[in-house]
């Protein structure tokens, strides 16, 4: 059962944003850094006059057959096309700065701390969102490479952005624990305490 085409058009948020004055802009870093593989999931953060973006780079191309799965690849409706010599699905993040025309003026790879050897095939901080809290920048996302089962847990990493030296470095990392029986979590947030 597919969705009604009229309903699909009504759900197109990008189209609605453009119709109401929004702009589209390509977010591209040099292909020498990405080897031509995917850029996705930008997280836009406006900090005063600065427009900052966390841009996710993956070492694969994702083929996904939408629209009632009418156009699947020979491997099925969802396929990861990755280098033959590296079967892992690796995420790296880039912090970018845009001007008011949404043109990229700076970009820098986020140097993550080497706290562990990845033990699952999904490697890196996935779907990271850039936030600022008490004048410190953080990336908040999910990491699945710390267990042999690929269990994803939210993590937040404090980062230092140094535009003068074109560096972004992870300073600290906190893995948000699984809630205990007497703890509660707010959706999309850090632990909220004892839940009492």
Per-range role (PLM):
Residues 1-121, 132-196:
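Beta-rich carbohydrate-recognition and catalytic domains
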Residues 124-130:
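A conserved donor-nucleotide-binding helix/loop in the catalytic core
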């Amino acid at each position: 059962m597919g969705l009604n085409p009229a309903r699909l058009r009504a759900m197109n948020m990008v189209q609605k944003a453009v119709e109401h004055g929004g702009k589209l802009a390509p977010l591209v870093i040099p292909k020498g850094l990405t080897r031509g593989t995917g850029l996705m999931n930008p997280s836009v953060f406006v900090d005063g006059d600065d427009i900052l973006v966390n841009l996710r780079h993956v070492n694969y191309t994702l083929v996904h057959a939408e629209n009632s799965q009418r156009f699947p690849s020979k491997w099925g409706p969802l396929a990861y096309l990755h280098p033959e010599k590296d079967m892992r699905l690796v995420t790296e993040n880039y912090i970018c700065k845009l001007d008011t025309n949404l043109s990229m003026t700076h970009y820098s790879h986020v140097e993550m701390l080497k706290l562990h050897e990845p033990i699952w095939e999904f490697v890196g901080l996935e779907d990271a969102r850039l936030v600022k809290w008490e004048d410190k920048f953080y990336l908040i996302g999910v990491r699945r490479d710390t267990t042999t089962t690929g269990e994803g847990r939210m993590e937040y990493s404090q980062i230092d952005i140094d535009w003068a030296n074109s560096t972004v470095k992870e300073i600290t990392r906190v893995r948000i624990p699984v809630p205990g029986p007497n703890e509660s979590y707010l959706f999309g947030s850090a632990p909220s305490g004892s839940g009492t």
